[in-house]
Amino acid sequence: MISPEQSRAARGWLDWSQDELAKRANVSLSTVRDFEKGRRTPIANNLEAIERALTAGGIEMLVEQDRAVGIRLSRT
């Protein structure tokens, strides 16, 4: 599952604001803001929507042993 750090890094790479990500993921701005600041973890559906939006933007989430470790541009 995506981490707050991955979300921030991916947004930066895509040059998206938190508002842009929220719109693309169809979640509230406060959901993105609170998640990225580590205030709370969104419900599973919202967390998946955030990850899908970033993936659709061309970002691949890197995970090792069930731990989020980074991002990279998608190869496809």
Annotate the PLM regions.
Residues 26-42:
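Recognition helix of helix-turn-helix/homeodomain-like DNA-binding domains
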Residues 59-76:
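Helix-turn-helix/homeodomain-like alpha-helical modules used for DNA recognition
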Residues 14, 43-46:
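Short, conserved glycine- and acidic-residue-centered signature motifs
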Residues 5-20, 74-75:
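Short basic helix-loop element that most often maps to the first helix and adjoining turn
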Residues 12, 23, 55:
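Short polybasic/polar patches that bind polyanions
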Residues 7, 21-22, 32-35:
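Conserved hydrophobic/aromatic packing and binding residues within compact polymer-binding modules
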Residues 26, 46-62:
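DNA major-groove recognition helix of helix-turn-helix/homeodomain DNA-binding modules
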